[in-house]
């Protein structure tokens, strides 16, 4: 959309008000016929701009504005269930947006439109691939392709995250185990994380589905979900990355699926590192955040 109103002034501000609003907060005010957008960062100004355009589209009176905004949630992320072969698990609207086979040589203009659309509603992160992850997403060839997407998304304040297979050290690194307490395994992850941040300095982190529906995980080695998540969190911590560890865990050995997440995670309360988030589904199974 194009702005059809009067003069607009965008300003970066380091005053107390904008420090309090954080790096994504902003103010919009009108003064003497001019609209002033102020924020502590360029990302805040981006969101302020979209807010102003949204008001215009709604037909609001934009001549007397006095707005302060601060996001209620720091991480506002999309989880794509896209596979590397272009299929989408539970996908009902065609194939994947990501043309991995083309990203070696070209970058589709659709990726910029994707970033613009998501930034306009405040999305600031995207997990590119299915939680039932192929280890290949962490190969050097694929990371180069991920870098190209990250470069397109960055101006719109969108960080890239990856779903990872917990057995990647075995599949890609040739190790004999993926035990999170094994020193070689931890070293492999630290080196892989270092490689990722060398390509994508603002990489968001990992999403992990472990020990659920046949996916590998720390429980295969007698370790807890916390021990598995914390090993990855330690590798990501120096770079500001996070781990999103899914709580959707169940196996066919117990008929009562609804209690399994509680039984596995409640004893681990307080044992996860501060850059680990336990991610639940907004559904009737994981701790019943929403009843059917």
What feature does the model see in each segment?
Residues 17-207, 237:
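Feature activates predominantly on carbohydrate-active enzymes
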Residues 1, 22, 26, 37, ...:
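Domain-scale selection of a single, long terminal region
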Residues 7-9, 159, 207, 242:
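Residues at or immediately flanking beta-strands
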Residues 148, 174-292:
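Catalytic-core regions of glycoside hydrolase
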Residues 12-17, 38-42, 82, 247-249, ...:
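Structural motif
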Residues 2-13:
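Short acidic low-complexity segments
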Residues 15-22, 258-262:
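Charged, often glycine-rich, active-site loop that binds/positions anionic groups
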Residues 1-4, 57-60, 153-157, 230-243, ...:
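Structural alpha-beta junctions
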